[in-house]
Amino acid sequence: MSRKVFYISDGTAITAEVFGHAVLSQFPVEFEALTIPFVETTQKAEAVKAQINDCFITTGERPLVFHSIVKAEIRDIIYSSECIDYDFLNTFVAPLEDQLGVKAVPVTHRTHGKANHSYEARIDAINYAMENDDGQTLKHIDKADIVLLGVSRCGKTPSSLYLSMQFGIKAANYPFIEDDMDNLKLPEVLKKNKHKLFGLTIDPVRLHEIRQSRMENSRYSSLRQCRIEVKEVEMMYKRERIPFVNTTNHSVEEIATKILDVTGLERHMF
């Protein structure tokens, strides 16, 4: 039987989910998770408490509760439920107050709320990533923080969007297709922005599997074509001295972090 887990917050619950998942992923146990955001009133907190208690009665095990609740009166209600409680905010707030010599000023939604310049930067970056996805236009490449290159289905779009949503980075991406392979070279506009270029590559077998799910038994998805494209693109990266990373078996979070590590790009979100 899987262990029940609750992620609870008086905001989006993203912080509780991220921290909780990072901890639980270390254990070879199956977890059944429920996320409950915007628990902003004592009435909502009482309803969540009842839900937790029902879970305990049903399973015979106290569920794990990861939360990032700012208001003390709401936290106290969750504390009083039949749960194993992990309070991320309070775990760090008191020691930091001692070190900084300043009392915390609790504000709901501060972590993932609308925060002036940071929020606007993220929205601008997301819009930019969508408008400059898959080589739709090269008119605004000069405004990019980074331009991701690669063959079709190697992870360019999700990586671009993650960089924009998570870090406020303006990421364009440009695909190399079958027709490019006979004489593969960078378009002039990309050559002029070579310092912004970053390549993605992928294992040909994995690329074949991904393309098969999209266009089964086509030339585009054939293992032979995948091998040709990956080989040609990697040779071009090396020839042009473009840094690149292999996306095979890596999550979009890992890919984005590797890109930031290699390029030294500044995060705009925090």
From Swiss-Prot:
Catalytic activity: [pyruvate, water dikinase] + ADP = [pyruvate, water dikinase]-phosphate + AMP + H(+); [pyruvate, water dikinase]-phosphate + phosphate + H(+) = [pyruvate, water dikinase] + diphosphate
Pfam annotation, one family: Kinase-PPPase
GO molecular function terms attached to this record: ADP binding; ATP binding; phosphotransferase activity, phosphate group as acceptor; protein serine/threonine kinase activity
Keywords for this protein: Kinase, Nucleotide-binding, Serine/threonine-protein kinase, Transferase
EC number(s) from the headed UniProt entry: 2.7.11.33, 2.7.4.28
Superkingdom field: Bacteria
Binding-site list for ADP: G150, V151, S152, R153, C154, G155, K156, T157
HAMAP family in the cross-refs: PSRP
Family of the protein in this entry: Belongs to the pyruvate, phosphate/water dikinase regulatory protein family. PSRP subfamily.
Role summary: Bifunctional serine/threonine kinase and phosphorylase involved in the regulation of the phosphoenolpyruvate synthase (PEPS) by catalyzing its phosphorylation/dephosphorylation.
Protein's name according to its UniProt entry: Putative phosphoenolpyruvate synthase regulatory protein
Organism of origin: Shewanella loihica (strain ATCC BAA-1088 / PV-4)
